[in-house]
Amino acid sequence: MSTVAEALAYKVADISLAEWGRKEIEIAEKEMPGLMALRKKYAGQKPLKGARIAGSLHMTIQTAVLIETLVDLGANVRWASCNIFSTQDHAAAAIAQAGVPVFAWKGETLDEYWWCTRQILEFDGGLGPNLIVDDGGDATLMIILGHKIENDPKMLDKTPGNAEEKALYQQLREVFAEDNQRWHKVAADMKGVSEETTTGVHRLYQMMEKGELLFPAINVNDSVTKSKFDNLYGCRESLADGIKRATDVMIAGKVTVVLGYGDVGKGCAHSMRSYGARVIVTEIDPICALQAAMEGFEVATMEDAVHEGNIFVTTTGNKDVITLEHMKQMRDEAIVCNIGHFDNEIQVDKLNNDPTVKIINIKPQVDKYIFPNGNCMYLLAEGRLVNLGCATGHPSFVMSNSFTNQTLAQIELWQKEYAVDVYRLPKALDEEVARLHLEQIGVRLTRLTPEQAEYIGVSADGPYKPEHYRY
């Protein structure tokens, strides 16, 4: 039986934090010229009028500026965080007080997390979203998996593989009991999703290959002004912030092992070296390994590096990169953290369920593990994103790049009709995003003469590089 109900207004930790949140949002706006330029450009046009946007993305001060930009452009928005530890409670309170339904607080349980994700997919009048802003793909996953369950209800009888899957299936079980065609109706109304991060993009391509993707998707992550800025320069600053706030450790003189040398790994390795650490990189890709070596980093296997490192950082987006056996072999007082999207890069479940290991909570998001040999290890943010779990994430300026791309992607999906596939934003928009951020940092561009433009075969107004160009 289908029922129509009014959607919940909001659920946050403490609405009285709204004034503090608003003050920080106003500061962030000054550091986010891309988003503010879009507000000015589209003032009065409301290019997202009629759009119902479900946002599953870290509920931070910077995200608040994105949310209010989407609202300014005409959208009806509901929001949740995409990580149980990443919400800044004062940011959530400010957005809730401004009238946007937000369901997020720092330190959610997995059951609460998936409940919050469900709330953003339930608009007034029993409607679902017609657009999604996703980070990691959980909102998209809930719709896709719910749709599959409606086709094959026996899926609800499966034994969950872990606590996260158990919590997700519980929400889907409740939805199915209320309306066994809910997700078919939601999917039919969807115009698309824009995905923020590498992990979520991998999910989208996998769904597309399997024929499971139900609506168009724009891969925001691989826009140059996202991956080469947010992933690289953002991590270069926020990793150290998270480690230091959590531990107060001196990085200089330490050995830091960075697992993975993609854009995120590059930012992390350079960050740690800039603080005076000796950095060892582990890699599976010969190209990335060669890049790391050419930058002067030692490249080794984890089996060799595990005995040397004082600090370990996973950046791969893969699972079981640091195993329980690795952790048992580490030096005394090692610090272990992750800056990839999910918590399965480190075998946290195995660690927590090992009866020979003693666990002592030091403070929120900092846990001490004592092994049978007497050595101890500190795990930050329970193996989830250290920069958001133990600090406040990337700086506003670099997030303006990413979120300007997200806003443009939402406009693109709303105003045009796309076939089901995974797309990227055109290079002209990528260049425009960069251009919007130049004045703020005092950059003046050289302009091609007509003769120069003709000589290299481009327009004087861009795009300046072919699609295959690697920045």
UniProtKB/Swiss-Prot annotation:
NAD(+) binds at residues 197-199, 231, 260-265, 283, 318, 339-341, 387. Binds 1 NAD(+) per subunit. Keywords: Cytoplasm, Hydrolase, NAD, One-carbon metabolism. InterPro entries: Adenosylhomocyst_ase-like_sf, Adenosylhomocysteinase-like, Ado_hCys_hydrolase_NAD-bd, NAD(P)-bd_dom_sf, S-Ado-L-homoCys_hydrolase_CS. It catalyses: S-adenosyl-L-homocysteine + H2O = L-homocysteine + adenosine. GO terms for cellular component: cytosol. The keyword Magnesium does not apply. May play a key role in the regulation of the intracellular concentration of adenosylhomocysteine. Belongs to the adenosylhomocysteinase family. This is Adenosylhomocysteinase. The lineage of its organism: Bacteria, Pseudomonadati, Chlorobiota, Chlorobiia, Chlorobiales.
